[in-house]
């Protein structure tokens, strides 16, 4: 029997998906992009739309199961929210959209709001948050909308099971979906209502098994989604959000860790947990109680309810890690005379001018801006006295258009001589490049401030035999790592002494903290 074409093969709400994807790039709070930078991250609206449209058939296809048509009619057909456009807002002529099941399904994926439609017809713009209607699958706010996600999951459930059994009715499929979904909710309630469930008693193990059985039973009747090049994890994440059993793989270890952090661990550990006050204090101590107060979580009748265990623990242990590391290396980052703590130090490597009569130590700067935005422009203005190069900090547009380091060649601001890229690399290979502390960026009550160095920063002693120093040799293929050819042959050489000292302290304290976490916490 010929199968119906999938919706993605026939039609997609491209304009709507594009609009929400542009918005997706600017969302920060709660977005997986804030976990770790990944250079080829796919927009979540695109992934959600593509996965959904790949799993459901075109309802106007002759081979589409009747149960799926009935599902659209029941779930979307009577809701004016999913009514097709009376006049498609992005076409140049009057263009009414037929009210049929396919278009209803497209409007469920993404539909411009009435305000946006009116503005588009008038040639006006609309704020990104207000472009799509509430209740659309791809809208950011729908990520945790139980009603919207339930519709999407039931449609996928119906499409998947009706394809295998074309004679089954939507009523029967709807009832089986509701029963399977309710079984998961009941199993979750039974498990997450238990007090001190991190202690693995026989009762807790039984309830954990019951929950896993309910989830497996549900997902056995849903399609599986596999992304062999998962990268930032957007496709596995959205497949899981739609109720499917999702699989992701990537050969890059950074991608693998990102996928663990964005897809696997939140699903496994990001659940509610209840503690007795005694057990909570035993695990978290006074610092944990302080965090409870800061988050507005109260102790009620000796019971503490944490809405999301993983979120709480990440914040708690992150504060512990930062406090331990700051205690050890904080003296390397002293506050200024006004008590403002540094956010960052701006250093530059310096090379020696190749002119024998000059020999100035020139910072390898490609540009002079410390801040260059539409609202704030701060730059370094060179002050040259003979072969001595210093800087002052000024606000406004920098009059110097190009830096002294251009395509690797260094132009000396003292004598005008050019030190070629080859000569600069030779100095680097012979360890002749030095470091110059140029500016400090501090956090004040008025925001970021930029200051000239007012202190001599101590360079810490580094034990290069320390187990936390990466002494491994780098690959010799220069096309894989851009630092090759500069005398950088081992990974630790990518960092300054200060950076190495801070990083080794960070890793050491992380290991200490990791060993303090009980095996029952995150098995």
Language-model region placement:
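S-adenosyl-L-methionine-dependent nucleic acid methyltransferase catalytic domains
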Residues: 1-523
């Amino acid at each position: 029997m010929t199968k119906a074409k999938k919706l993605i093969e026939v039609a997609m709400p491209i304009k709507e998906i594009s609009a929400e994807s542009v918005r997706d790039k600017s969302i920060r709070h709660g977005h997986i992009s804030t976990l770790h930078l990944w250079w080829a991250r796919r927009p979540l609206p695109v992934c959600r739309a593509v996965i959904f449209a790949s799993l459901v058939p075109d309802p106007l296809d002759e081979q589409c199961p009747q149960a799926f048509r009935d599902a659209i009619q029941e779930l979307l057909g009577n809701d004016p929210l999913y009514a097709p456009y009376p006049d498609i807002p992005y076409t140049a002529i009057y263009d009414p959209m037929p009210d049929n099941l396919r278009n209803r399904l497209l409007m469920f994926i993404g539909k411009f709001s009435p305000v946006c439609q009116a503005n588009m017809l008038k040639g006006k713009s609309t704020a990104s948050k207000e472009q799509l209607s509430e209740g659309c699958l791809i809208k950011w706010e729908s990520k945790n909308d139980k009603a919207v996600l339930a519709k999407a999951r039931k449609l996928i459930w119906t499409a998947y099971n009706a394809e295998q059994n074309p004679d089954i009715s939507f009523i029967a499929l709807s009832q089986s979906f509701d029963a399977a979904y309710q079984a998961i909710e009941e199993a979750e309630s039974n498990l997450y209502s238990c007090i001190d469930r991190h202690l693995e008693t026989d009762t807790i193990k039984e309830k954990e098994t019951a929950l896993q059985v309910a989830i497996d039973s549900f997902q056995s009747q849903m399609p599986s989604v596999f992304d062999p090049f998962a990268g930032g994890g957007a496709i596995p994440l959205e497949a899981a959000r739609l109720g499917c059993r999702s699989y992701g793989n990537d050969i890059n270890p950074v991608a693998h860790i990102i996928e663990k952090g964005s897809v696997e661990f939140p699903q496994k550990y990001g659940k509610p947990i209840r503690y007795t006050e005694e057990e909570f204090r035993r695990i978290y101590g006074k610092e944990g109680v302080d965090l409870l107060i800061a988050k507005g979580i109260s102790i009620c009748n000796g019971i503490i309810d944490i809405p999301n265990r993983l979120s709480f623990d990440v914040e708690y242990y992150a504060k512990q890690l930062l406090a331990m590391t700051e205690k050890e290396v904080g003296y390397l980052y002293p506050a200024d005379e006004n008590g403002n703590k540094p956010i960052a130090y701006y250093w530059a490597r310096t090379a020696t001018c190749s002119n024998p009569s000059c020999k100035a130590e020139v910072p390898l700067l490609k540009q002079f801006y410390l801040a260059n935005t539409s609202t704030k422009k701060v730059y370094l203005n060179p002050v040259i006295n003979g072969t001595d190069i210093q800087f002052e900090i000024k606000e406004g547009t920098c009059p110097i258009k190009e830096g002294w380091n251009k395509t690797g060649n260094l132009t000396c601001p003292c004598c005008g001589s050019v030190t070629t890229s080859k000569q600069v690399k030779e100095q680097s290979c012979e360890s002749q490049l030095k470091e110059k502390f140029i500016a400090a960026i501090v956090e004040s009550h008025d925001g970021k401030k930029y200051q000239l160095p007012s202190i001599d920063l101590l360079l810490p002693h580094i034990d290069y035999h320390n187990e936390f120093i990466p002494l491994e040799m780098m690959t010799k293929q220069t096309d894989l790592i851009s630092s090759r050819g500069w005398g950088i042959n081992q990974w630790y050489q990518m960092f300054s002494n200060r950076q190495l000292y801070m990083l080794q302290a960070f890793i050491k304290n992380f290991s200490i903290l990791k060993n303090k976490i009980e095996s029952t916490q995150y098995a």
